[in-house]
């Protein structure tokens, strides 16, 4: 029986069994000098990278040059920011890219968490280090009292820490916004499940390689027969 030519110019194998032959053909690249793999990887990995967490994405960026380029892609870090923090800032364009914006947001949230740890532990020296030593810093406690300037602010915290015990807040709905060397954080902080939340705004400035608090405003919302808000 005569053999039938194959599409690639070859002929089928002789014998009773069939055998599949895989051939590699050259496909014209639409980008001269760039392999098909390099063209396909960004398209394939963009979706896959959105499933990685922060440590995994950082580790990936330290592998080969191709993966490093993919892991440093702005869209990957924007997706991670939205997954870990909030969708509220979808329309912004960070000056130094989403990777740095993500890292700075983590740093701000860490400092903000430290603030509540200091309150819980009544650590006055740590609170003094957290605040910027400046005459323009402001602190408004839930009582409505305003303290202005570094010395007054720290003295106000000393009075708070002289109470019998520290406060262990449960913090929720944390939202940050960063503008170069300034950031503010809004949140709700609860002392117990029955009471209403404290509505808190903290403002930080970046000085000498560290984020320092420059403004704290706490108002309390009491939920009973009626809702009372202290601003």
Curated annotation (Swiss-Prot):
CDD domains: F-box_FBXL4 (cd22117)
GO terms (BP aspect): protein ubiquitination
Biochemical pathway: Protein modification; protein ubiquitination
Positions of the F-box domain: 34-80
Region (Disordered): 1-24
SUPFAM superfamilies the record matches: F-box domain, NTF2-like
Pfam families per UniProt: F-box-like, SnoaL_3
Keyword entries, A-Z: Ubl conjugation pathway
Domain notes: The F-box is necessary for the interaction with ASK proteins.
Function (record text): Component of SCF(ASK-cullin-F-box) E3 ubiquitin ligase complexes, which may mediate the ubiquitination and subsequent proteasomal degradation of target proteins.
Subunit comment: Part of a SCF (ASK-cullin-F-box) protein ligase complex. Interacts with SKP1A/ASK1.
Name this polypeptide is given: F-box protein SKIP8
Organism per entry: Arabidopsis thaliana
Native organism taxonomy: Eukaryota, Viridiplantae, Streptophyta, Embryophyta, Tracheophyta
């Amino acid at each position: 029986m005569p053999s039938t030519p194959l599409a690639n110019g070859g002929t089928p194998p002789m014998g009773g069994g069939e055998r599949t032959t895989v051939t590699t053909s050259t496909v014209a690249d639409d980008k001269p000098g760039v392999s098909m793999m390099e063209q396909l990887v960004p398209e394939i990995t963009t979706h896959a990278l959105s499933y990685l967490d922060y440590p995994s994405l950082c580790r990936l960026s330290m592998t080969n040059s191709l993966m490093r380029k993919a892991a440093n892609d702005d869209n990957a870090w924007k997706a991670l920011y939205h997954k870990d923090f909030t969708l509220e800032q979808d329309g912004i364009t960070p000056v130094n890219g989403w990777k740095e914006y993500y890292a700075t947001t983590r740093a701000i949230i860490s400092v903000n968490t430290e603030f509540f740890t200091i309150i819980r532990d009544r650590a006055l020296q740590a609170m003094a280090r957290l605040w910027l030593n400046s005459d323009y810093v402001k602190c408004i406690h839930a009582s409505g009292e305003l303290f202005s300037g570094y010395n007054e602010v720290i003295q106000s915290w000393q009075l708070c820490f002289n109470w019998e015990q520290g406060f262990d807040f449960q913090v929720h709905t944390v939202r940050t916004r960063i503008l170069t060397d300034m950031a503010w954080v809004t949140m709700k902080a609860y002392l117990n499940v029955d009471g209403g939340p404290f509505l808190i705004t903290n403002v930080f400035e970046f000085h000498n390689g560290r984020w320092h608090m420059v403004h704290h405003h706490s108002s309390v919302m009491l939920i009973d027969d009626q809702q009372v808000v202290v601003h």
